[in-house]
UniProtKB/Swiss-Prot annotation:
<keyword id="KW-0961">Cell wall biogenesis/degradation</keyword>
<comment type="function">
    <text>Murein-degrading enzyme that degrades murein glycan strands and insoluble, high-molecular weight murein sacculi, with the concomitant formation of a 1,6-anhydromuramoyl product. Lytic transglycosylases (LTs) play an integral role in the metabolism of the peptidoglycan (PG) sacculus. Their lytic action creates space within the PG sacculus to allow for its expansion as well as for the insertion of various structures such as secretion systems and flagella.</text>
</comment>
<dbReference type="InterPro" id="IPR000189">
    <property type="entry name" value="Transglyc_AS"/>
</dbReference>
<comment type="similarity">
    <text>In the C-terminal section; belongs to the transglycosylase Slt family.</text>
</comment>
<dbReference type="GO" id="GO:0008933">
    <property type="term" value="F:peptidoglycan lytic transglycosylase activity"/>
</dbReference>
<dbReference type="InterPro" id="IPR008258">
    <property type="entry name" value="Transglycosylase_SLT_dom_1"/>
</dbReference>
<dbReference type="GO" id="GO:0071555">
    <property type="term" value="P:cell wall organization"/>
</dbReference>
<feature type="region of interest" description="LT domain">
    <location>
        <begin position="271"/>
        <end position="478"/>
    </location>
</feature>
<dbReference type="GO" id="GO:0016998">
    <property type="term" value="P:cell wall macromolecule catabolic process"/>
</dbReference>
<dbReference type="InterPro" id="IPR023346">
    <property type="entry name" value="Lysozyme-like_dom_sf"/>
</dbReference>
<dbReference type="Pfam" id="PF01464">
    <property type="entry name" value="SLT"/>
</dbReference>
<keyword id="KW-0732">Signal</keyword>
<feature type="signal peptide">
    <location>
        <begin position="1"/>
        <end position="29"/>
    </location>
</feature>
<dbReference type="GO" id="GO:0009279">
    <property type="term" value="C:cell outer membrane"/>
</dbReference>
<feature type="region of interest" description="Non-LT domain">
    <location>
        <begin position="30"/>
        <end position="269"/>
    </location>
</feature>
<dbReference type="GO" id="GO:0009253">
    <property type="term" value="P:peptidoglycan catabolic process"/>
</dbReference>
<dbReference type="Pfam" id="PF00497">
    <property type="entry name" value="SBP_bac_3"/>
</dbReference>
Amino acid sequence: MFPDSSYLFSMRSLSRFLIAIFGCGALLASCDSFERSVLPFDKTDELVVITVNSPDTYYENAEGSYAGLDYDLATEFAKELGMKVRFKTVPRLDKAWSLLEKHKGHFAAGMNISAKHSRHVAFGPIYQLVQPQLAYNTDYNKPKNLHQLGGRTIRIAKGVTHAEQLNKAKHEVPELKWKEMDLTPDELLARLAEGKVDYVVADSTQINLAKNFYPNLNAAFNLGDSVGRAWAFSPFAEQALLEATQKFFTRIQQDGTLTRLLDRYYGHIERLHHTDVNGILAKRRTILPELREHFYEAEELSGIDWRLIAALAYQESHWDALATSPSNVRGIMMLTEITADRMKVTDRLDARQSILAGARYFALLKDKLPTRIKEPDRTWMALAAYNQGPSHLEDARILAQKMGLSPDAWVDLKKTLPLLSQSEHFRTLRHGFARGGQAVVLAESVRIYYEILQKYEPPYSWGFPIVARKEDDSWQEF
């Protein structure tokens, strides 16, 4: 869950941050001879950000662009300041702390607040709460507490704050053992899934992300209290930078930007059960090879990543070309008769016809959305429209506007789509009742299946859309 705004921006947090501002300013005044590694904030147009290269903060996505919560936050911050942004990526957190201490960047992003580091750095406002947890391999018995580890060694990534929680726990569990490793939490969790280490302590977000790729991973129990995540600044950070940071986080919390970004990266990660993950991983080896060429062709036809089309097909039918619902929705893409006719499908149970038609229809739904709706929200809304139709999606957008929410933000439509099944809402809308909750489930599930396929399946590396839409009647308005 996301942190409560009253916690994130409490007066206590603000007071601590303002103390840090004036403390750092005083320290800077007494350190004129300090040799800087980055230009002063007020003497440069480039913001230098230190961050770890990981799916939790900063990474290269399937399109070859950079993404991640802290990438988006830092980019938005630089844009607000009218500055360029440059990222210094490191493989592990200990390297990030080291670079920060040497003032190699203006701040380090995605850092967990800890008592140890608070003595040496200033932390900005908390923008996310994470829960340290003990992860275990579900092929073995689940420990209920630290006493049940049987003398086995816990692994943690070097530079993380979890050593502080473990040191506290050792007072009650003297036999507790752990080892810091020159690996990222993601790499440690992969080793845990492979049975190469006994236990791993990591943040809840990291474990939940990893569970979608390694279904034999799970959290056994929480370790201590939740921890705030924030940007960390060296003692030599300028007062103007610290004040600008406070102003920025206050703004994005108040206008909903922070909520939307947290939902973009974490709002869907706990949707699937481990059996769902096991299912797609197994069928990826047995069924997907027979369908892969059809999905490649669908990407050429629609311009949509074949792995997204395959994820949608898996959610709809588990890649069963003969799937049929009680309402006569049929085929691998579960097309209605009306949609099949519109897409000129002669046999809905023909896998190739169904996949190509489903991809074209999905692309058409995306094209019909207002151009102001940006990715990735545009894709998630198109998925919802694929499930319940564009008219009901538009009703949900209208309802969002009536409720003071954004009709262009997926995080807000996740709230209004389920309301389409409630009479107090749907009787006020043009298109009436809809099972909008189903659309949310479909879109959120496809998001995870897509991430799984992105991890294990390479992109289709050649070819461009080969069908001219104007020459194909099935691309016309509907």
